[in-house]
From Swiss-Prot:
NCBIfam families: NDH_I_N. It is found in: Cell membrane. NDH-1 shuttles electrons from NADH, via FMN and iron-sulfur (Fe-S) centers, to quinones in the respiratory chain. The immediate electron acceptor for the enzyme in this species is believed to be ubiquinone. Couples the redox reaction to proton translocation (for every two electrons transferred, four hydrogen ions are translocated across the cytoplasmic membrane), and thus conserves the redox energy in a proton gradient. It is a multi-pass membrane protein. The lineage of its organism: Bacteria, Bacillati, Chloroflexota, Chloroflexia, Chloroflexales. Its main location: membrane. This is NADH-quinone oxidoreductase subunit N 1. GO terms for cellular component: plasma membrane. Pfam families: Proton_antipo_M (PF00361). Belongs to the complex I subunit 2 family. It comes from Roseiflexus castenholzii (strain DSM 13941 / HLO8).
Length: 540
């Protein structure tokens, strides 16, 4: 098992992200900028443009590499021969094959995750370009890129040490981004809280890895002590079967790993950091944190549990411990209830969406429960439901927090009261926010409806009927606080009728998110087949 030169194309998007981050940081540092406001605005604009163009290029390369999405035709003697040849070469040396060094998978699952993170980073960049970045914009965008790189590696990791390093790369970048606005009262506090809770979760996750490593080493010693890489997910899965799956050391390690990642995806009771951080961080960072970061945590948790602990899967029963699906069922139950009920009294829009995000984490756990089924078809459906929900949720939340970023920039407040009479001040923004909020609520025919429908079906097929029933009830409860947005924007009188414009780049990001939410709602099969193809690989 060694790294070959032919493996380089398989990690080309990650290499491009690394080079792009260094380029953005270097160009900002090496260019002499004036100290005036105009010079700083130009500095932020150039850094944002370079980041957006670079991320767009990386997205295109990742899209072309994903040969299961489409096949690049052979050159036919035309003006596009150079591009077609390049595309064919990218696909030939792209995804597929066994994991690199056994630790980095380049399967369809990785391809879709990679595109999701890069797309989210691109939209976040557009939102940030429409926001006021007052200092060191090169650092801001470089950290955003490095965080995206960490997330991409997280989703591809099939080895514990690589997963941990990727998690830290992503997290350390986000800690700094959360506290980016040092002149703000809330931003440094948000960064500090996120750092403290994130450091604790990383320590818990690492301790779980050490316990799991000890289990594998112990079992391997019993089997004769053959040389192995005990931190590979596949090696853990090979030993965690039969009676060994009930080993206290393995179960304890699994519990610590779930708890460590539980902080990253903000499930109850590991959610306490989320409302304060979401409210205090710069709005574009909150948008990225609530979407791409959560998606990366879920995808790592999914690959880890289904690859390293398939022998301890159990069944999603609330009344007894029966494997990791029992743990996830309990977490899903309390997360759905606490997240939605805690959102009811909130008056700050970002804090309200933070608790909403916690509730959505509970819905997402329902899709993972279907892994308890012995049927590959059921497992494929559950995996596809998880991926579909993450994509739709990311688009919807990015757009929603994008609207709040515009409001904060224009009005200086992100309270619900600041949204009163919004339709009289910015009709297009009001219409887009209405669509996005209705999608979060799961109203048909928007994409959020299908996302919830698929995860509820996954939970039902897994046999977690009581849990699905409670989730449906909490969905109805969530309508109350989602409709508060609509009441404020459309019904309550505006404190002052002063029209304002949405920055063009931020407007483009919000429009793109909204259009995709509507399109995926009207045509859910547009990406469902592709997602199912990727899910079938992950469900084997």
């Amino acid at each position: 098992m060694s790294f070959q030169i032919t493996d380089i194309p398989r990690i080309l998007p990650e290499l491009m992200l690394l080079l792009l981050g260094l380029l953005v940081l270097g160009s900002d540092v090496l260019t002499r900028w004036g100290r005036g406001p105009a010079a700083q605005l130009e500095r932020a604009r150039e850094a944002g443009q370079l980041t957006a163009v670079g991320l767009g290029l990386v997205f295109i390369v990742g899209l072309v590499q994903s040969r299961f999405l489409f096949t690049v035709p052979d050159p036919a003697g035309g003006p596009l021969d150079v591009l077609l040849t390049l595309g064919r070469n990218l696909q030939t040396g792209g995804p597929g094959g066994s994991p690199i060094l056994g630790a980095f998978a380049t399967d369809e699952f990785t391809m879709i995750a990679r595109l999701t993170f890069i797309g989210a980073a691109f939209l976040t960049t557009l939102l940030a370009m429409g926001y006021r970045l007052t200092a060191n914009p090169g650092e801001f965008y470089a950290l955003l890129i490095f965080s995206t790189l960490g997330m991409s590696i997280m989703a591809a990791a099939t080895e514990f040490i690589l997963a941990y390093l990727a998690l830290e790369l992503s997290s350390l970048s986000l800690y700094v981004l959360a506290g980016y606005f040092r002149e703000s009262e809330r931003s440094p506090e948000a960064g500090l809280k996120y750092f403290l809770f994130g450091s604790l979760s990383s320590a818990i996750f690492l301790y779980g890895i050490s316990l799991t490593y000890g289990f594998v080493a112990s079992e391997n010693q019993k089997a004769g002590g053959a040389p192995i890489i005990a931190t590979l997910f596949s090696e853990v899965g090979r030993f965690a079967t039969g009676d060994a799956a009930g080993s206290p050391l393995l179960i304890l390690g699994m519990l610590f790993i779930i708890a460590g990642l539980g902080y990253k995806i903000s499930v109850v009771p590991f959610h306490t950091w989320a409302p304060d951080v979401y409210q205090g961080a710069p709005p574009p960072v909150t948008a990225f944190l609530s979407t791409a970061s959560k998606a990366a945590g879920f995808l790592l948790l999914y690959r880890l549990l289904t690859t390293a602990f398939p022998g301890a899967v159990g069944a999603p029963r609330l009344e007894e411990f029966n494997g990791w699906t029992s743990i996830l069922a309990i977490l899903a139950l309390v997360t759905v209830i606490v997240g939605n009920l805690a959102a009811l009294p909130q008056t700050n829009a970002r804090r309200l969406l933070a608790y909403s995000s916690i509730g959505h984490a509970g819905f997402l756990l329902l899709a993972v429960l279907l892994w308890a089924s012995a049927s590959p078809v059921d497992r494929t459906f559950g995996t596809a439901a998880l991926i579909y929900y993450l994509i739709v949720y990311s688009l919807t939340n990015l757009g929603s927090f994008g609207v709040l970023a515009v409001l904060t920039n224009a009005l200086g407040s992100d309270d619900l009261s600041a949204m009163q009479g919004l339709w009289r001040r910015n009709m297009s923004l009001t219409l887009m926010m209405t669509i996005l909020i209705l999608s979060l609520a799961g109203i048909p025919p928007l994409a959020g409806f299908w996302a919830k429908f698929f995860v509820f079906m996954a939970g039902y097929q897994a046999g977690a009927v009581p849990l699905v029933t409670i989730a449906v009830i909490m969905t109805v409860v969530s309508l109350y606080y989602y409709l508060r947005f609509l009441k404020a924007m459309w019904i309550l009188p505006a404190p002052a009728i002063t029209p304002f414009k949405t920055p063009p780049v931020a407007n483009a990001a919000i429009i793109l998110s909204t259009v995709l939410v509507v399109l995926l709602g009207l045509l859910p099969n547009l990406i469902w087949g592709t997602i199912s193809s990727a899910a079938s690989v992950a469900a084997r």
